[in-house]
């Protein structure tokens, strides 16, 4: 169905020397990690405080138990494994094609797949 597009992308990768990947939630949702903003994402769930408040420094100082409970329940996915996208990006880095991964994901799956130059930027 997308053979032509995949072939075009492969040609671009083959001809490139310094690729930077910009990614977000779509990469990790394939590893069963929920995103933040979809209809059933983290920001749509019901809590006494918003996720932004709960993960803030001031909330942590005032309520460390609540912070850790939320973090453990909603931010840690110990069973998640890198998927094909994570693995392919690590392979491209190892081959010297990929210079950096810039991601909004804070799940560590790019690093678990073997990528070394990962910038996690969320917020």
Which residues make up each language-model segment?
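Conserved catalytic core of sirtuin-type NAD+-dependent deacylases
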Residues: 1-123
């Amino acid at each position: 169905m997308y053979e032509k597009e995949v072939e075009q992308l492969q040609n671009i990768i083959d001809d490139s020397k310094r690729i930077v990947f910009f990614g977000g939630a779509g990469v990790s949702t394939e590893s069963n990690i929920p995103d933040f903003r979809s209809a059933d994402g983290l920001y749509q769930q019901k809590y006494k405080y918003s996720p932004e408040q709960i993960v803030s420094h001031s909330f942590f100082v005032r309520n460390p138990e609540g912070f850790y409970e939320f973090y453990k329940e909603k931010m840690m996915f110990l069973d998640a494994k890198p998927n094909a996208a994570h693995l392919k990006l690590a392979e491209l880095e190892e081959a010297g094609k990929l210079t950096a991964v810039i991601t909004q994901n804070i799940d560590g799956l790019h690093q678990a797949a073997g990528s070394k130059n990962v910038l996690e930027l969320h917020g």
